[in-house]
Amino acid sequence: MGKNVVILGTQWGDEGKGKIVDLLTEEVAAVARFQGGHNAGHTLVIDGQKTVLHLIPSGILRSNVACLIGNGVVLAPDALLSEIKTLEDKGVPVRQRLFLSPACPLILPYHKALDLAREERLGSAKIGTTGRGIGPAYEDKVARRGVRLGDLAKPERFAEKLKEIMQYQNFVLEHYYKVAPIDYQKTLDETLKMAEELLPMMADVTDMLHEFRKRDENVLFEGAQGSLLDIDLGTYPYVTSSNTTAGGTATGSGFGPMYLDYVLGITKAYATRVGSGPFPTELFDDVGAYLAKKGNEFGATTGRPRRCGWFDAVALRHAIQINSVSGICLTKLDVLDGLDVVKVCVGYRTADGAEITRPPIDCEAFGEVEPVYEELPGWKESTFGVKRVEDLPKNAQDYIAFLEKQIEAPIDVISTGPDRNETITLRHPFSA
């Protein structure tokens, strides 16, 4: 029997999903993206060679894996073609392996202009977006005025749709944000030119997924960003514009939720966040700087330094619940090597002194809580590259056991380094 496994981040993104997706693609016939856009950044290291992917699923490096981009993904044609060229220059035959849903909304130049103008207008209250037009493209989708990949198959109809929406968006750019409009003819010509390369990769992704299911083949669904950035369930408004939680798998691909067999939550052994928003365990001391330096905490997409903090079991329990997580993959354990003490947030103290064990829904209230910590002894020995749990330092094993108890979920996979073979697998998602 084939299995359908979802991989998603359980924190604020940057949890190390790319490596784990690449590791698990040994078992699959297909990998599918179901939300987000080129604001995602997946860094893969294979035999010491670094590859950063933004739109294309991480399985693209495997010759026997179909890579699908579902309807929930917003597609920037220029970014996708640039990524394809980068991979083709490395000898990867992308166009034979990549399939795009015609229902993908397109990100076009006016979306990026709106994104940048909006962040500029917000000033110190900015969300901290990547400035790549993701949010405005999702807005157009929900407002039912967006253009989709399938529209490019009929150039005359596309030209009419584009003209109508650009009249609206250019009015907003000029008269509200007081910035230069985007040229319609240039946008039309460039997009139709790119369509010549994109349309041959267009396919009914939903139907393909169900064909894999009927043939009892394994499929992996690759999430982007993290659960605490979900548009509905994250730290709103400091969130992304898509559903990053398990529910987005079904709506972003057309693959019903009852067909999903296992949800793997990718979780760092500490916590990081890029951009603005609540982060109760954030560290501003030498330990925070240590984690940032040792963990190389800079965004794969933006290059921005990530905020670093201790492991937050309260936020993670919430993520486990809203995703029906089957098991956790703990990443970057080796970054904690050398610390005398490691802390885990086990509760929050509110502004009025009450202790709570769930994150506040209100973002302002979330930003005011203070973490309640449990301290555990650290370890001096290296965990880097360890492949068996019994070979980990005793204190590292105790840390993992403590986390399991706090989050009320099994830790099935432990990553001890960036390469795919630097992994401890306690329970394999495709055989669980």
From Swiss-Prot:
Designated name of the protein: Adenylosuccinate synthetase
Keywords: Cytoplasm, GTP-binding, Ligase, Magnesium, Metal-binding, Nucleotide-binding, Purine biosynthesis
Residues holding Mg(2+): 14, 41
GTP-binding listed as a keyword: yes
Gene Ontology biological process terms in this record: 'de novo' AMP biosynthetic process; IMP metabolic process
HAMAP family referenced in this protein's UniProt entry, alphabetically: Adenylosucc_synth
Alphabetized SUPFAM superfamilies for the sequence: P-loop containing nucleoside triphosphate hydrolases
